[in-house]
Amino acid sequence: MKQILFMDTTLRDGEQSPGVNLNEQEKLQIARQLERLGIHVMEAGFAAASEGDFQSVKRIANTIQNATVMSLARAKESDIRRAYEAVKGAVSPRLHVFLATSDIHMKYKLCMSKEDVLDSIYRSVTLGKSLFPTVQFSAEDATRTARDFLAEAVEVAIRAGANVINIPDTVGYTNPEEYYALFKYLQESVPSYEKAIFSCHCHDDLGMAVANSLAAVEGGALQVEGTINGIGERAGNAALEEVAVALHIRKDFYKAEPSMTLKEIKATSTLVSRLTGMVVSKNKAIVGANAFAHESGIHQDGVLKEVTTYEIIEPALVGESQNLFVLGKHSGRHAFTEKMKELGYEFTNDERDAVFEAFKKLADRKKEITEEDLRALMLGEAAFAAQQYNITQLQVHFVSNSTQCATVVLKDEEGNVFEDAATGSGSIEAIYNAIQRILGLECELADYRIQSITQGQDALAHVHVELKEGAHQVSGFGVAQDVLEASARAYVHAAGKLKSFIQLVK
């Protein structure tokens, strides 16, 4: 049975989702979790896009040990060399070079002839192969490219040294029958077909990204590209967790097994959702809150008698387990550290001390600490530690009518303390006005969302905010048992990003 490899582009294509703005530390958190998920290749970013992207790609490349780290590049020498500088320190570096092959792209975007495109493919892949052990070539907008020319372009790329050929459905235009037929056509029409691994990359504009990816596997694709939770620009990408579980459950049909640690799916989905601020729909397949819920009396009766009557996926398969008690206020530092290691977290002594202190504070207020609490705690403390400013004091009191007054004290990375107070129509507005006064910002609150991320009256709150000033928009999040504290943390997280970005642009 063939093994299907997965190329995750959450950190590149996924980050292009409107409103998503991950910092370097957040990208590294996701990369480490993708490594635990067993992702074969992770596209860490587009190194030539900016200095920030370059540094993020480089740090991920120098950190990840058990996956190939890849950078995107246009078919330009400067892009390719920049990508090499970013990922050369990786255990397994790869170049992903792309060039459009459809008539509409060649005419209106590239202003290049077919001959020019073929020449550019050959030169860019040849250069890439002289620097990288493996090169992936993507024929952008392949599904709207004339088949004979696509086959010619693919052959040129393979002869130039490409190890992986990606056939992307860039605008989500195709359907499963057409996509399957396209892979079969290339299998028959490309003389050097057997010398490369063929890959699929599907967008969800018509709601068929997962179905198209599975059709590509039927047609001979050995690598599937996509993102966690299906995030991405426009309608998003193929959700890798859905493709992987579909292959596993229906291996009788696809004759293929996913090369992925399925039990890490839920944890990965949750991390990506919270860091990006993109909430997973409750009825989403595999990872939605209702994915394993049964409300119908007939269904409940059937499941109680025999679970397979209405459940084709065991929740434990994807790491969806009961919210079991694991630690309490009497748990010591050693037990805490061992449990965090079991969950896949590693940190320095200073990081451990900070998270353990936060754990003890939570344990004093919450009788039972679950794995979900620990994951949320780690997520919140990691974001808190990476901020330019941290909240050291927060006070809110009633003034008159609906007016509230908030006093906020912040400390920066150098230990400088800043304090200010402001009023507002409610506690949240007062807190945010005070933070704006301290940081000297005049930004608009574009989005504010709050959700409970653990169960019970003593649940942890996760607050996501988006701030906008002019053309600049950033997001931030905060985790705490107290809603006001979580809200303040989220605002400081986003405001610090916004201030840094504005200073960088200036």
UniProtKB/Swiss-Prot annotation:
Its cofactor is Mn(2+). PROSITE patterns: AIPM_HOMOCIT_SYNTH_1, AIPM_HOMOCIT_SYNTH_2, PYR_CT. SMART domains: LeuA_dimer. Pathway: Amino-acid biosynthesis; L-leucine biosynthesis; L-leucine from 3-methyl-2-oxobutanoate: step 1/4. One of its GO terms (biological process) is L-leucine biosynthetic process. It catalyses: 3-methyl-2-oxobutanoate + acetyl-CoA + H2O = (2S)-2-isopropylmalate + CoA + H(+). GO terms for molecular function: 2-isopropylmalate synthase activity; acetyl-CoA C-acetyltransferase activity; manganese ion binding. InterPro entries: 2-IPM_HCS-like (IPR050073), 2-isopropylmalate_synth_dimer (IPR013709), AIPM/Hcit_synth_CS (IPR002034), Aldolase_TIM (IPR013785), LeuA/HCS_post-cat (IPR054691), LeuA_allosteric_dom_sf (IPR036230), LeuA_bact_synth (IPR005671), PYR_CT (IPR000891). It is an enzyme of class 2 (transferase). Its main location: cytoplasm. Pfam families: HCS_D2, HMGL-like, LeuA_dimer. It is found in: Cytoplasm. Residues 390-506 are annotated as: Regulatory domain. Its EC number is 2.3.3.13. Mn(2+) binds at residues 13, 201, 203, 237. Homodimer. NCBIfam families: leuA_bact (TIGR00973), PRK00915.1-3 (NF002086), PRK00915.1-5 (NF002088). This is 2-isopropylmalate synthase. It comes from Bacillus anthracis.
